Amino acid sequence: MSKAATVDYDYARTWAEHDPDPDTARQVMTWIEEGNTDELAAAFAGPLAFGTAGLRAAVGAGESRMNRAVVIRTTYGLISWLKQHVDTPVVAIGCDARHGSAQFQRDAAQVISAAGGKALVLPAQNPTPLTAFTVRSLKADAGIMVTASHNPPADNGYKVYLGGRIATGPAEGVQLVSPADAEIATAIAAAPHADEVPLSTDNIVDVDTRAEYLDRAAQLVGAHTDVTIALTAMHGVGAALGEKLLTRCGFRVSLVPEQAQPDPDFPTVSFPNPEEPGALDLGIRHAEEIGADILIAYDPDADRCAAAVPTSSGTWRQLTGDETGALLGDYLARQGATGNFANSLVSSRLLGRIAAHYGLGHEETLTGFKWIARTPDLAFGYEEAIGFCPDPTAVRDKDGVATSVVLASLAAECKAAGTTLLERLEGIYATVGALYTQPLTFRVDDLSIIAQAMDKVASTPPAELAGSPVAKVEKFAQGSKFFTDNNDRVIVRPSGTEPKLKCYLESPDADRLDAIAADLRAYFGI
């Protein structure tokens, strides 16, 4: 059966007739009139899956895209589920600067208001961590953040936190997990047509928690001077809050001018993710021009944070997520952190060693901050994909803005001592033992290739890697781990969001990583 043959024209027409947005309704009707089965099949490939990351898709017409109809029905399902648990649910709502974000925020607020909830609406174009902070600080029962984080420009999304009377203890203010996600998805499926969902402005309250957020984040460090920071928001929403925080703490801040203002088209980068090759080129150029001590880069919704530093040879080097995680963990431990450190299982084992060195607890969790943030008595958590949580009491999620001030403080400490962040990292290796990491990713067009690769891993794992026998194989819900006699570790798992097979390589000998990668390429044959 062809893709075109699966189009239900009556369903698409009914959707368009009940779409509250005349533009997307008109688009669907145009496709119907033209007989454009390819576009219709893509737009009606099934409802957007409401998972633990909420929703994320391209902005456009139809049930499979991000649009007003989808946001309205999703919010109806969410508030219906919340009302099963509490009376008059209180929901904080934030949004970034992507296409459609402000409208989606207004729609969500009006649905919550009409359903008997109370909507706390944050100023538009602000970081995701501000919404997460607001859920905890104002004891909201839930939080909605309209964002697609570092996705391509065409996308938007809808992220949900639970708190207040719904989630308490370590889970307060954290992204939802199963079974709540499935229960909310069921409620969304039962929602009426979008234009039949009541809207109201009666119970909408504008709230602004930026001052409280800045007060809290500023307490993470003391006042510093004599450190110059090049800061880029990657065309996202982090510049204003980040610059205020860093300046307040005494740092000299210079924004990368081409990337300072929010722009949903992200014109200077091919992909708005600080991890991507070339994404920091403008930032590094600016850092060199102003003689910066460090370059700090937020991703578009500022929940993640990358750093680059000058080397002894005069070039600049971007720190990996694992390197930054080790530096932050060591710094926070030396500043008197108590409780537990945590990182995802695909992140380096180095944080566990650092925690043990300072007498702190350590937990290894499944991938995703929804699991890291649930660690009891959490003092610091991170994932290798440049996500860091330096103040979990305030923000139980990744927080690029708060992370940036801790990184800046660490840079100031190093400068005052006549050393560098890279030298500090070597000092950590000397104290607890070196571990170096490297990613290896296989992108495929056919998802069956990934399934075959994972079957091979389960049935016949590699006998050796870079000449060292594989001594142990451990399976976990998302994949497998290999350990060699040399204490190398390889983790293999499918990507949860893209058609990729992801491998995470770690070794006490950096020179072995390329050889391990070569052996894995030969092993998988992809």
Question: Over which residues does each language-model region extend?
Answer:
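N-terminal small/polar loop signature for handling phosphorylated ligands or for N-terminal nucleophile
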Residues: 92-155, 245-307
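Gly/Ser/Thr-enriched, mixed-charge loops and adjacent short helices
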Residues: 15-19, 23, 37-48, 156-287
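Phosphate-binding and adjacent anionic-ligand microenvironments
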Residues: 288, 292-294, 298, 315-317, ...
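Short acidic, glycine/serine/threonine-rich loops at helix termini
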Residues: 102-107, 132-136, 154-162, 196-197, ...
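An N-terminal, well-structured beta->alpha segment
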Residues: 3-108, 114-115, 203-227, 237
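Conserved phosphate/anionic-ligand binding catalytic regions in large, soluble enzymes, centered on
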Residues: 44-64, 148-151, 233-241, 245, ...
